[in-house]
Amino acid sequence: MKRIAALLLLCLLLTGCSWDSAEYYSATPHKIKEQKTDESIPAVSNYNELYDAVADIVEKGAVTGRMSVEEYRSISLENNLSFVETDIIKRHPIGAYAVESIEFEVGTAVGMNAVGVTVNYSRAPEELQGIKAAKDMEKAKTLIRETLTQCDSALVMRVTNYEETDFVQFVEDFAAENPDVVMELPQVTVSVYPESGDDRVVDIRLSYQTSRESLRQMQKYVQPVFTSASLYVSSEEEGAIVRYARLYTFLMERNAYKVETSITPSYSLLRHGVGDHRAFATVYAAMCRKAGLECFVVTGTRNGDARSWNIVRDGDYYYHVDLLSQSGFILYKDNQMNGYVWDYSAYPACGVAQQPAENNG
């Protein structure tokens, strides 16, 4: 009896050398130690099932895994194992983004033919855990807006209904439309994994010259100024032109301005009185929009030099406004913009009544 008990104890100790859900150990090169249960072992019998099983391991960010291949033809299995590694790395979103290589060990587990899988990642575990989910491009854009608002330097997201998008242009547009949020336009680097498909990982890196802490402090200063501007023209009893003019006064009389370019345009303009034509036009347009007034930023030239100015709306009419024209708040029609050149097709005609949209219903 003592000999039998000793043998049973030895068997129990040996079973501790087999795989569990997190990792596996192998005492011999080509044998997978048996366990008491096979509930956690998926069974695969063809390439699609093999791909899905390996993909599931990668999806979880697991380092090791295993699968039963009891019903898999041995000749096909050997060929498919070498192919599935390439397929996962090239075709699967997480595989393309984070997997360096995949190793396989053919043996037995729970008395069945099985394959052990070891995944070697090129990314740290926290990077994999930090991937955000986006069901479509609208959600992806929301995540980008949140990243810019928080002044974060990176966003990695998995977009399951991916569409080709100019992310650099999207960041530039958001920054131009929200100078109360984006203090500095970052340098944007975008990588997409894999190269094709509807399900992809998008890795966006944002490089700032200013520290995140400083950018957040700038936001705290700038945002109340925009709120004050809205309150300054909160009376809707005043006509649109009066409100545009009041916002002009609010901005232009705030500082004795020096016309220079800054990497933090809205903050430098509102706090230090330093800004260029682009900063004035962008900040003024944002103040107008937050007050419920329609306002565009126009990019063009004046006498051959780069120039930005605004277009505002009064009823059915649009007008040009150049805050740095040295002439005060004056509304201009298109034919009065001497020396200015812009893309006429990109903006509404100014000084001409707008035609109502045709109703095809």
Segments and roles (model prediction):
Residues 210-270:
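Secondary-structure boundary elements
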Residues 1-4, 8:
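Positively charged n-region of N-terminal signal peptides that target proteins for export
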Residues 269-278:
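Periplasmic OmpA-like peptidoglycan-binding domain that tethers envelope proteins to the cell wall
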Residues 18-236, 350-361:
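N-terminal accessory/pre-domain segments preceding catalytic cores
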Residues 43-49, 133-136, 262-265, 332-334, ...:
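Alpha-helix N-cap recognition
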Residues 279-346:
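Hydrophobic/aromatic-rich core segments of domains that either
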Residues 13-16:
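C-terminal motif of bacterial Sec signal peptides marking the signal peptidase cleavage site
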